[in-house]
Regions:
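Active-site-adjacent structural elements that line small-molecule/cofactor binding pockets in enzymes
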Residues: 1-322
Length: 322
């Protein structure tokens, strides 16, 4: 019998506030990162957006978090491939891995939020084109992490003997997460990623009815099966599974602000969400049991339960050693 995967909990990067005086935000932010580390979280998750009030640059925040801690890992969840040249991104992550003693990861997706592209004046190509670019970029990044010179001739990227320096500290490489919700994205994750971020399938505007439907227990099962099938076809072990709970309520504390559309969809289809990992609700003991069951039945080991540390810390304390 295969041993159950170890639980690894992620929490979102703390938001910048309004610290008093020069360095006030930085000091508070560093203290919060160290608190996350001391509570036993595996990693802090960094997202990347350029609209809707998003404050931080992802890579700068990532490096600050690594410099402010000694054990905590940092995992982009996720970077928009269209905003980074893959070779430059791979070099940045490899450098962060070396300087942090092996605590960096790279999480990457095809880009989905049209507002980001509009704000930057960037071309929001059709999804198949964005996924094609991500496929090539992922191949470049994983090759770079081997330390071998990178020569690549694709439709979207071309490299000629690029020196893959520095060589990352982690062996065989910093974890590569590919996140998405559609069949092609899940297949890509299964074929080459170390971690598959299984999520809702988001359209240009974000969370909609299709996304909500795709988070039922049956849909999550199908998504994870697609990842496993792609890994098998590629002749490699299936990647670890990362999942974000959209509705977390621990002992009456609403940890994540549930989206009205999602709430309405759950209320209209209670049977579909009766045992979906999308919604974690109950006292601490019940939440622990649900997470253990979903890990054992679905294989989900990386969990993002939101950023209310006080509410979810007891769960992390109970499960992070398993």
């Amino acid at each position: 019998m295969t041993a159950a995967a170890t639980f690894r909990f992620l929490t979102p990067m703390p938001r910048l506030g309004s610290g008093a005086g020069p360095g006030g935000d930085a000091a508070r932010w560093a203290a919060e990162l160290r608190r996350i580390e001391d509570l036993g979280f595996h990693a802090v998750a960094v997202s990347e957006h350029y609209s809707r009030g998003w404050t931080m640059d992802a890579l700068t925040a990532m490096n600050f978090a690594l410099a402010s801690t000694t054990r905590l890992r940092v995992m982009p969840l996720v970077l928009n491939n269209d905003l980074h040249h893959p070779a430059i991104l791979a070099k940045a992550i490899a450098t962060a891995d070396v300087l942090s003693g092996g605590r960096a990861a790279v999480g990457i997706g095809a880009g989905w939020l049209a507002d980001d592209y509009r704000a930057l004046g960037a071309d929001y190509a059709a999804a198949p084109v964005r996924i094609d670019r991500l496929t090539e970029a992922s191949q470049i990044i994983t090759t770079f992490f081997t330390g071998r010179p990178v020569t690549f001739g694709g439709r979207h990227y071309r490299l000629d003997g690029l020196e893959a320096l520095p060589r990352p500290v982690q062996d065989p490489r910093p974890p590569v997460l590919v996140g998405g919700g559609g069949p092609r994205m899940l297949a890509l994750a299964g074929s080459l990623a170390d971690i598959a971020g299984v999520h809702a399938r988001l359209g240009p505007g974000g969370f909609d009815a299709r996304a909500a439907k795709g988070l039922s227990r049956a849909s999550v099962n199908r998504k994870i099966s697609l990842v496993a099938a792609a890994a098998s076809k590629a002749g490699r072990p299936a990647p670890a599974i990362q999942f974000t709970c959209y509705d977390v309520n621990v002992a009456g504390v609403q940890v994540t602000p549930i989206r009205p559309l999602f709430s309405d969809f759950i209320d209209a289809h209670p049977a579909s969400f009766a045992d979906s990992p999308t919604s974690l609700r109950g006292e601490i003991g019940k939440c622990v049991e649900d997470l253990q069951r979903w890990r054992d039945e679905l294989g989900i080991s990386y969990w993002n339960l939101g950023g209310n540390l006080d509410a979810i810390a007891p769960i992390v304390a109970r499960l992070s050693a398993e």
